[in-house]
Structures are given as structure tokens and as C-alpha cells.
């Protein structure tokens, strides 16, 4: 009998709402809308709305939290101190695991929407050279260099995904794409899980094809 549905992380399609004959509006309490069968909603003249921009600052912050963890080898150095290996060292500077700074690195952003733009601004403040690839092919942003997909993969030291899940982005990061990245590349996915072929990413990490990866999203959650 509902006229309006308010939900998140629930599939909305003919199977789930086929008997909801009074439904006029579906409200998603998130930014992503890949859980909606929009063609079916259009056929039934059911409107939908999302909350664009609600998580921009949080996701941008989490992007850098993951990057710092990987870039500065924080797990290794945290364990090194907690296991009391530092107190027994003969030198005060221990650099068994090398790390580097963001300044001067090329940061490639896949999907320069609200979140991608915020990440770009912060990366620029750290001194990174920011480039981006438009997954829709229509997004042009002042202040940053737009490039093609292959160039972004080949030249970026850090690659972060902030794109929605669409037919253009599903399985975008596969074995072929990963093979074009630098061996030193750090890859971050903060878009949607199915943008990445997880088996291909695992292979790339295990073989040393890329240096590291941070995943905020997975194909199946919880994994």
C-alpha cells in the first residue's frame, strides 16, 4: 500500500516491488543508485531520488586514510614498534620498508564527480599532479587535465576510482587494465565493487604487477 519507499542497499525491481501498486516515489538514502532498476521504474512512472553529496567529505577522507596506510607502510612500522623490535635496533632510523611522499606524484582519478573533485583538490594541496578520466565521456572539469583511460593507467603513481557502477564502468579494472599500470602503482577503489574484477586484482597483487591496493567496496559485502 506504500506510496513512498525510503531505503538503502535493497534491490528495487519488478521482483521486489511488482505488487506495490500505489508506489509513486523511491528514495535512496545514499548517493549510489545501482540497486534501482530504473527502466522498470520509468515504465511504471515511479520517480526516484538519491542523496547526492552526503558522503563527499567522508569518502575523500577515507581515500587518504587508505592511501597513507599503504604508502607509508604503516602496518609494518606499527608492528615493528609494538613487537619491541625498535628498542633492540642499533640505529634510530629504520627504513626496511621504503615509503615516499605524495608531492610530485601523478594521481589519476577515475570519475571526477563531487567525490573525485574533492579528492583531486586535496591531492593537489599535497603537491600531486592530478589527471582524470571521465567514465561518462562528457565530464570536463576546469583545473585538472582530462586524459584517456590508457594514458591514466600508464602514467599514474596513484589511481583512485570514484565512479558509479554503470555499463561503462562494470569490470573496467580487469587484467588488461592492471597490466598497463606501473609496478609501483597504488590502486584505490572507492566507487563500487563490480568496477573491479577482483580475481584479476588478486593476481596482479600476488605477482607484483602493481604495488598495493585499497578497497572500500567489494563485489559481495560482507566478503
PLM regions with names:
Residues 29-30, 45-57, 134, 191:
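Short beta->alpha connector loops at strand-helix junctions that form conserved
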Residues 112-113:
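Glycine-rich Rossmann-fold phosphate-binding loop(s) that bind the pyrophosphate
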Residues 116-117:
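N-terminal Rossmann-fold NAD(P) dinucleotide-binding loop
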Residues 1-49, 154, 174:
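An N-terminal-biased, well-structured beta-alpha scaffold segment characteristic
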Residues 46, 52-106:
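Phosphate-binding beta-alpha-beta segment of Rossmann-like dinucleotide-binding domains, i.e.
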Residues 106, 120, 128-129:
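Residues at the starts of beta-strands that form the adenosine-phosphate
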Residues 13-16, 136-223:
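Rossmann-like adenosine-cofactor binding region
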Residues 23, 103-106, 175, 184:
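Phosphate-coordination loops involved in phosphoryl transfer and adenosine-cofactor binding
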Amino acid at each position: 500500500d506504500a506510496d513512498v519507499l525510503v531505503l538503502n542497499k535493497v534491490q528495487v525491481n519488478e521482483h521486489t516491488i511488482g505488487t506495490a501498486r500505489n508506489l509513486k516515489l523511491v528514495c535512496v538514502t545514499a548517493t549510489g543508485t545501482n540497486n534501482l532498476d530504473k527502466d522498470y521504474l520509468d515504465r511504471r512512472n515511479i520517480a526516484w531520488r538519491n542523496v547526492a553529496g552526503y558522503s563527499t567529505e567522508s569518502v575523500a577522507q577515507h581515500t587518504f586514510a587508505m592511501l597513507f596506510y599503504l604508502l607509508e607502510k604503516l602496518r609494518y612500522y606499527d608492528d615493528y614498534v609494538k613487537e619491541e623490535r625498535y628498542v633492540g635496533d642499533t640505529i634510530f632510523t629504520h627504513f626496511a620498508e621504503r615509503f615516499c611522499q605524495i608531492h610530485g606524484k601523478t594521481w589519476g582519478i577515475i570519475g571526477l564527480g563531487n567525490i573525485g573533485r574533492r579528492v583531486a583538490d586535496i591531492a593537489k594541496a599535497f603537491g600531486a599532479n592530478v589527471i582524470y578520466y571521465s567514465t561518462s565521456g562528457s565530464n570536463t572539469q576546469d583545473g585538472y587535465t582530462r586524459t584517456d583511460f590508457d594514458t591514466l593507467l600508464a602514467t599514474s603513481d596513484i589511481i583512485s576510482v570514484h565512479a558509479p557502477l554503470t555499463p561503462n564502468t562494470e569490470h573496467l579494472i580487469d587484467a588488461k587494465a592492471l597490466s598497463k599500470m606501473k609496478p609501483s602503482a597504488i590502486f584505490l577503489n572507492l566507487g563500487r565493487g563490480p568496477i573491479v574484477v577482483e580475481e584479476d586484482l588478486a593476481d596482479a597483487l600476488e605477482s607484483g604487477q602493481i604495488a598495493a591496493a585499497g578497497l572500500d567496496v567489494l563485489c559481495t559485502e560482507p566478503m
